Amino acid sequence: MAAHVIDQRNAEKTLGNLSAAAVEALEQAALTTTYPTGAVLFAESQAPRGVFIVRRGRVKLSVSGSDGRTLILRIVEGGDILGAASVIAGREYEATAETQEPSEVSFIRQSDLLRLMRGSGEIALWVTQHLSSDYNCTCREIRDLMLSDSAGEKLARLMVGWLDHSGETKQSGQVKMALTHEEIGQMIGTSRETVSRLIAGFKKQNLIQQNGATLVIPNRMALESLITA
């Protein structure tokens, strides 16, 4: 892992809605590190050390049950803050954060973040906005998981969500599917075998096409027709 100061271009991308003074304050408190694939930033039930700001790459947030099963809550990309709720509340991290690919991540210690929030209403509002976004995202994901009647509907919801996230608003589009069938199963609460069977069925019905890691959805409305709730 290589540690270095925050790259200004990444700062503009991640902290672009903050004033120059607020960005500078955060930069001075942050240590940025390049992590390899599979690095654990923090673990579920671990005492909070600080927050992690994803500058580049992708990070998986997951929780584990007593039976050993894993549920992926979401995949985080550049611009998101991880661990803020635990740091502010002084409670254990509620999930495990693991890099999905080589990633550049900034770390700000708990004491430094709280100090910055007390001293700057702008930074406090910025953190609060991220917490609100996380809450809304969690509610939406719980709704999708609980109100879907079948694994097929959950998979359709997930793929339509990928289109929305990528900004594809047309009736057809393509996205990068950088998850294994096992990881997709962990996102929708089913087995790898079920995911493989469903994807094969979707292809047979021409609901999706796949070229390597590129997922093509030729008819969004056809895929959405599987979503009942």
PLM features per residue range, with description:
Residues T14, A39-P102:
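Cyclic nucleotide-binding regulatory domains
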Residues M1-V40, I81, S86-V87:
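Cyclic nucleotide-binding regulatory module and flanking cytosolic helices
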Residues L158, W162-A229:
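Phosphate-/nucleic-acid-contacting segments
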Residues S62, A84-A85, R115-L116, L158, ...:
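Residues that scaffold the ATP/ADP-binding catalytic core of kinase and kinase-like folds
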Residues V51, L73, V105-S106, K176, ...:
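A residue-level structural signature of the nucleotidyltransferase/glycosyltransferase Rossmann-like core
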